[in-house]
Design a protein with these regions (language model features):
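C-terminal segments of enzyme domains that contribute to small-molecule binding surfaces
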Residues: 2-16, 20, 71-92, 98-100, ...
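A short beta-loop-beta micro-motif enriched in histidine and acidic residues
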Residues: 49
Length: 177
């Protein structure tokens, strides 16, 4: 794995987390217990910080990045990802807040200042534009993402299932090392 410091700040990775050897984690990134970071993920906490909550999985090819302090973005935009979150393959999450128990679908993009509330599901390929507030308990799809309906019971259950499944999978990978 490529774990790199940026300036004087090194990533902090909890015991029991899994970072695949083909992933890149740079700078001010904190990865909590039971997190899994899969191949080709880039988590670049260079110009602001990234925090990833317990039991979250970041799937293959996803990009996690932040925005710096500037006149366009005073204070910049860090990236906060809660616990039990699934970030699907090739998603881009940039300078936003994703609360607990969310799913960000494959190839979805969540931009600066957006907030994805607990229990929300952002559909594959959707775009959450800067500053959008994504209400929890609903499916959001499209470009820009729009609330289309309440999550069904099976979808709500899947939020928990996905987090647990990826904890089990990363434990298999860890035991094979």
């Amino acid at each position: 794995m490529s774990i790199r410091k940026y300036n004087t700040i090194s990533p902090v990775i909890a015991a029991g987390a899994w970072v695949d050897e083909a992933a890149v984690v740079i700078g001010d990134v904190a990865i909590a217990e039971d997190v899994s970071i899969w191949p080709m993920v880039v988590a670049r906490g260079d110009v602001n910080w990234i925090r990833i909550g317990a039991r979250t999985n970041v799937q293959d090819g996803s990009v996690l990045h932040v925005s710096h302090d500037s006149s366009f973005a005073p204070g910049g935009y860090p990236l906060s990802i809660g616990a039990d979150v699934t970030i699907g393959h090739k998603a881009v999450v940039h300078g936003c807040t994703i609360e607990d128990r969310c799913l960000i679908g494959m190839s979805a993009t969540v931009m600066d200042g957006a907030v994805v509330r607990s229990g929300a599901m952002v559909g594959a390929g959707s775009l959450v534009p800067p500053g959008q507030d994504v209400e929890g308990g609903y499916l959001w799809v499209g470009t820009p993402a729009r609330r289309v309906r309440p999550l069904r019971e099976q979808e709500r259950d899947f939020l928990d299932y996905s987090a647990k499944h990826y904890v089990d999978l990363k434990n298999e990978y860890l035991s094979a090392c």
